[in-house]
């Protein structure tokens, strides 16, 4: 998948340039973000796209020494099921 990056957002577009999936993570301090929203277009759900988005974010956060709190229920569950990223999640 060809994810795109913007400040505090990783997303996926369709051929028309429309957002079809995203994870948002506003910065709350210098080295901390809040993963507050995960979205996948209903016609694409069940294909593991949200999992790939949050993993992409976790790798990005680790690489940049940024910690995350999660207020998005999907992200909370994802980090609980991926203890290999405990160093990223607060």
Identify the function of each model-found stretch.
Residues 1-5:
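Conserved N-terminal entry element of GNAT/NAT acetyltransferase domains
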Residues 6-9, 15, 23-32:
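A conserved beta-strand-loop-helix scaffold within acyl/acetyltransferase catalytic domains
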Residues 28, 36-38, 71-74:
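Acidic/polar N-terminal loop/beta-strand segments that form early-domain functional surfaces
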Residues 38-45:
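A short, internal acetyl-CoA/4′-phosphopantetheine-binding micro-motif in the GNAT/acyltransferase core
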Residues 46-59:
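Conserved acetyl-CoA-binding loop-helix of GNAT-fold acetyltransferases
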Residues 56, 60-90:
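C-terminal structural segments of small proteins and small subunits
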């Amino acid at each position: 998948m060809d994810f795109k990056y913007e400040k505090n957002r990783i997303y996926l577009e369709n051929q028309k340039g429309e957002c079809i999936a995203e994870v948002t993570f506003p910065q709350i301090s210098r080295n901390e973000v809040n993963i507050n929203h995960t979205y996948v277009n209903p016609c694409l759900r069940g294909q593991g796209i949200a999992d790939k988005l949050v993993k992409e974010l976790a790798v990005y956060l680790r690489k940049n020494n940024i910690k995350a709190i999660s207020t998005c229920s999907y992200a909370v569950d994802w980090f609980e099921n991926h203890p290999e990223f405990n160093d990223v999640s607060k």
